Regions:
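Conserved HGGG/HGGXW glycine-rich cap/lid loop of the alpha/beta-hydrolase fold
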Residues: 10-64
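Active-site acidic short loop of glycosyltransferases
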Residues: 18-20, 45, 86-88, 241-242
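Conserved alpha/beta-hydrolase "nucleophile elbow" surrounding the catalytic nucleophile
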Residues: 27-29, 94-99
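Flexible "cap/lid" loop of the alpha/beta hydrolase fold
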Residues: 114-170
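Active-site loop/oxyanion-hole signature of alpha/beta-hydrolase fold enzymes
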Residues: 7, 41, 51-93, 97, ...
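N-terminal cap/lid segment of alpha/beta-hydrolase-fold proteins
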Residues: 1-11
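Structural signature of beta-strand start/N-cap positions in the alpha/beta core
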Residues: 22, 48, 89-91, 116-117
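Conserved serine/cysteine hydrolase catalytic core
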Residues: 192-252
């Protein structure tokens, strides 16, 4: 599996498999490229898949944190990858944070030129909520979402001397997981996932596995991105003149 050299000298891991028409898959926050295999591996004889592991996850877990915010950094990394396939147009599957990265690339770069068709899953074109746009991330629960993220940010700032979740004191680790559980419960209540997380939360030895990332500095970087994000990609999506499908909304 190849690693691609990024502008800052870090090596981004991209899972590649299959043969045929190229498909670029952009994962959501906390995902690793192998998690797509149950859905995509069966199509390997017809398509060649390219699935980057974002910095901090999977094969890119040891990449250093850049100075840019997470979405700008992801687009810079993705654009560097695309430069090595200058004449290639991909079927694009973009999920959650990966969809934000795709929209960012359409708005600020030439990502549209690399898109043959586009599947957009579970992401709003504008994360923030204001008087002009009520359909941001979590919509009417957006303020609650921001409070949870700020609580996690404050906790991480108070424990900046630690590198990993396992380095935290038991009480701090429990509080961190408690805040993450609140985030999970915000997504769908009631839900089987939330119930499973609640049971895991009650088991001390399982708590750290509830978190999508074990490095605290990366966790802080990603969360800060969602706290600060003010981009509006609606005009970018209007520019997209390729076949596109959107799975988005409360019941998607």
């Amino acid at each position: 599996m190849p690693h691609y050299l990024m502008p800052d000298g870090e090596k981004l891991y991209v899972r590649e498999f299959g043969q045929g028409t190229p498909v670029l898959v952009l994962s959501g926050l906390g995902m690793q490229s192998w998690q797509w295999l149950p859905f995509l591996y069966q199509h390997r004889k017809k398509y060649r898949f390219y699935i980057p592991d974002w910095r901090g996850f999977g094969g890119s877990a040891q990449c250093k944190i850049p100075t840019l915010d997470a979405i700008s950094s992801h687009w810079q990394d993705l654009n560097c990858f695309l430069n090595q396939y200058a004449d290639t147009a991909f079927h694009v599957i973009a999920y959650s944070m990966g969809a934000t990265t795709a929209m960012h690339g359409i708005q600020y770069g030439h990502f549209k030129d690399h898109i043959r068709s586009y599947l957009h899953i579970d992401q709003t074109p504008k994360i923030s909520v204001d008087a002009d746009w009520l359909h941001g991330l979590f919509a009417e629960k957006h303020a609650d979402f921001k409070v949870i993220l700020q609580n996690i940010t404050d906790l991480l700032a108070q424990n900046a001397q630690y590198r990993l979740v396992s380095d935290l004191t038991a009480s701090m680790r429990t509080e961190l997981v408690k805040q993450w559980l609140a985030f999970i419960q915000l997504q769908a209540t009631p839900s089987r996932t939330a119930a499973l997380f609640q049971k895991a939360f009650q088991q001390i030895h399982l708590q750290k596995f509830m978190l999508p990332i074990q490095r605290l500095d990366y966790m802080a970087w990603y969360i800060q991105n969602y706290l600060d994000h003010q981009e509006d990609y609606r005009n970018a999506l209007r520019q997209l003149d390729r076949p596109a499908t959107f799975f988005i909304g409360e019941d998607s």
